[in-house]
Regions:
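N-terminal glycine-rich anion-binding loop in soluble enzyme alpha/beta folds
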Residues: 1-66, 130-162
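Generic structural signal for hydrophobic
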Residues: 82, 143, 170-173, 194
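Short, flexible loop segments at boundaries between secondary-structure elements
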Residues: 38, 123, 158-159, 202-218
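N-terminal glycine-rich phosphate/adenylate-binding segment common to multiple enzyme folds
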Residues: 66-111, 177-191
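Structural motif
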Residues: 73, 158-169
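Short, well-ordered alpha-helical microsegments
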Residues: 14-15, 98-101, 114-116, 136-137, ...
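Hydrophobic alpha-helical
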Residues: 88, 162-166, 177-198, 205, ...
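Conserved mixed alpha/beta catalytic, RNA-binding, or beta-rich assembly cores of soluble enzyme
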Residues: 91-97, 102-136, 141-145, 149, ...
């Protein structure tokens, strides 16, 4: 069975992130490798400092915050790890941009994929749902750097239907081309619910990889 690399910013395994990929395309074997597999837990900075702080999980389920720059070389190791195991391509299961990350085989990054899709549609004004206030500033700059005019909304943690109405109230009198869900690890039904109620195109960085995999044949 052909293999696809599933690149994680935390520790492997992450069945909650990989099972949706298996459901999207069961004709591949998914080889997981996590950035934090390559460091001792004691070496993970207790107080991360940097422009882009990301949240992930350790193997035991604990949540940690890590800086994009700390993760970058570790992700390169994770890519090399899955490529040694014969993958045909790799997918990054994280909404962080990680510009410059690469391997010998094709690597698909959600932020880059979403940017390409929106530019192909001529979109510029976008609303972006940030997972928390900590990441809001970095997420805002990420989309500005890619040529968009973002409106950043920090997810208040409401159920999907209530969240949709909250977003609608936040965007009153404002027109946007897309709503971007800028995080991963949530139920795939979230985007569908928001799209139906808001009546705007929703691009979900947690779902975009699975959507792509449905169109790949071994």
């Amino acid at each position: 069975m052909p293999r696809i690399g599933a690149i994680l910013i935390g520790q492997s395994p992450r069945p909650d992130l990989v099972k949706p990929l298996q459901k999207a395309n069961p004709h591949f074997q998914y080889i997981e490798s996590g950035a934090l597999d390559f460091v001792d837990e004691a070496d993970i900075p207790a107080t991360p400092r940097g422009e882009y702080i990301l949240t992930t999980r350790l193997r035991d389920g604990r949540i940690v915050e890590v800086d994009e720059k700390f993760l970058f070389p570790l992700l390169q190791k994770a890519i090399a790890d899955v490529e040694r195991q014969g993958v045909t391509l790799s997918v990054l299961l994280c909404a962080g941009p990680f510009d410059g990350l690469s391997g010998e085989k094709p690597l698909y990054r959600p932020t880059a994929m979403a940017s390409t899709i929106m530019h192909s549609r001529g979109s510029q004004r976008i609303a972006v749902l940030s997972p928390n206030q900590t990441q809001a500033s970095a997420i805002n700059q990420k989309w500005i750097d890619r040529g968009f005019s973002p409106i950043i909304l920090v997810d208040p943690g409401l159920p999907d239907v209530e969240l949709a109405h909250w977003i609608k109230s936040q965007l009153s009198f404002t027109s946007v081309d897309h709503l971007v869900i800028d995080y991963v690890g949530h139920p795939i039904e979230k985007a569908k619910t928001l799209e139906q109620i808001l009546n705007i195109s929703v691009i979900d960085l947690g779902k975009i990889i699975g959507d792509m995999l449905r169109h790949i044949t071994p």
